[in-house]
């Protein structure tokens, strides 16, 4: 009875230690991807927050071209003072296997000096691909997430007002040709290159589908032999993508955003014992203007302005602190927090730790 209990306990510990994920969560099918679309159009119906046409002549030119296509002729030399129109760029993504008549979301962004696109309506805008072919037509009311108000020279703004979205705002008019179903092989691409994971996925497919069904070509690509025909390949991929593989531990990595000062690390990061001293150097420059005037008004003196500059240099910190060896993410966080460093200081500390061989991780600065 005791032996059975211990066996069950060991099996439970092993199953909880190993993390299994589906192949579909780790890979994508090569060639099955989105395609970017772009277009140029006009937004109308703005509440006086559109482009200043004297500074954005392309807005007036676009409006004249559109009116002429509708049979309306604007006299030459007419100075149209428009406030409710804005020139915009429209972007969208054409999904894989997108069919004619299907709707997609679009993003609308101001091109000129419009103050806000809130309440505007995008007029019919053709969306083109890199081959200059029209694949979709966009039109509809824009939803802007920000808000703002101004009066008496003061203004308040929350979030961005010069961009918005139109949900299901474009209709697909042309389908992209697809090579899916052509040939007897397909390539699965790993989201992150990993030789061991690529080989493990190939071995898993071979165990279920037979030896030679899958081959790992490199650290990112697994070539799979599939039956011919669209329906047969769909069924084959559906079975393969639901197979589960044991995920190997990730590479230890620390990602630093130099613009925002944020530091992110995964659970594989470890620290070796080291000593850290971090000092802050601040320089303050204060400049004042001293005015010197003569005591006697009729003595022929002259008022003189002399600048006075004061420079203050302060250096704080610098005491040597010990950092213990840490093998788990929680201990790493505690060890770094014990230094009392700001995120900006932490970036320099982590770089120095890696140079000294104390940080067991890849350091990536974005």
Swiss-Prot record:
Residues 1-20 form the signal peptide. GO terms for molecular function: structural molecule activity. GO terms for cellular component: bacterial-type flagellum basal body, distal rod, P ring; outer membrane-bounded periplasmic space. The keyword Signal applies. InterPro entries: Flag_FlgI (IPR001782). GO terms for biological process: bacterial-type flagellum-dependent cell motility. It comes from the Bacteria. Keywords: Bacterial flagellum, Periplasm, Signal. Assembles around the rod to form the L-ring and probably protects the motor/basal body from shearing forces during rotation. Belongs to the FlgI family. PANTHER family: FLAGELLAR P-RING PERIPLASMIC PROTEIN FLGI (PTHR30381), FLAGELLAR P-RING PROTEIN (PTHR30381:SF0). The basal body constitutes a major portion of the flagellar organelle and consists of four rings (L,P,S, and M) mounted on a central rod. NCBIfam families: PRK05303.1. This is Flagellar P-ring protein. It comes from Escherichia coli O6:H1 (strain CFT073 / ATCC 700928 / UPEC). The gene is flgI.
């Amino acid at each position: 009875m005791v032996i059975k209990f211990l066996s069950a306990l060991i099996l439970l510990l092993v199953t909880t230690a190993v993390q299994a994920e589906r192949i579909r969560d780790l890979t994508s099918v090569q060639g099955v991807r989105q395609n970017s679309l772009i277009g140029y159009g006009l937004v109308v119906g703005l509440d006086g927050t559109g482009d200043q046409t004297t500074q954005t002549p392309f807005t007036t030119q676009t409006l004249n071209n559109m009116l002429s296509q509708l049979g309306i002729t604007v006299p030459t030399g007419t100075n149209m003072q428009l406030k409710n129109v804005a020139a915009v760029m429209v972007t969208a993504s054409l999904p894989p296997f997108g069919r004619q008549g299907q709707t997609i979301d679009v993003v609308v962004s101001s091109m000129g000096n419009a103050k806000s696109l809130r309440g505007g309506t995008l007029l019919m805008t053709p969306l083109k691909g890199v081959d200059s072919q029209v694949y979709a037509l966009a039109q509809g009311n824009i939803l802007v997430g920000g808000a703002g108000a101004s009066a008496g020279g003061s203004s308040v703004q929350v979030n961005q007002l010069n961009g918005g979205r139109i949900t299901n705002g474009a209709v697909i008019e042309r389908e992209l040709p697809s090579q899916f179903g052509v040939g007897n092989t397909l390539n699965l691409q790993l989201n992150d290159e990993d030789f061991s994971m690529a080989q493990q996925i190939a071995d898993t497919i071979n165990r279920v589908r037979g030896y030679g069904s899958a081959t790992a070509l490199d650290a990112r690509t697994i070539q799979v032999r599939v039956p011919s025909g669209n329906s047969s390949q769909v069924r084959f991929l559906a079975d393969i993508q639901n197979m589960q593989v044991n995920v190997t531990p990730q590479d230890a990595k620390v990602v630093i955003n130099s613009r925002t000062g944020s530091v992110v690390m995964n659970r594989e990061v470890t620290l070796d014992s080291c000593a850290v001293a971090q000092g802050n150097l601040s320089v303050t420059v204060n400049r004042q203007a001293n005015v010197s005037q003569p005591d006697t008004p009729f003595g022929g003196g002259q008022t003189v302005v002399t600048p006075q500059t004061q420079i203050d240099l302060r250096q704080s910190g610098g005491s040597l602190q010990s950092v213990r060896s840490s093998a788990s993410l929680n201990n790493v966080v505690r060890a770094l927090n014990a230094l009392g460093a700001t995120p900006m200081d932490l970036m320099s500390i982590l770089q120095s730790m890696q140079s000294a061989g104390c940080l067991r991780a890849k350091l990536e600065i974005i």
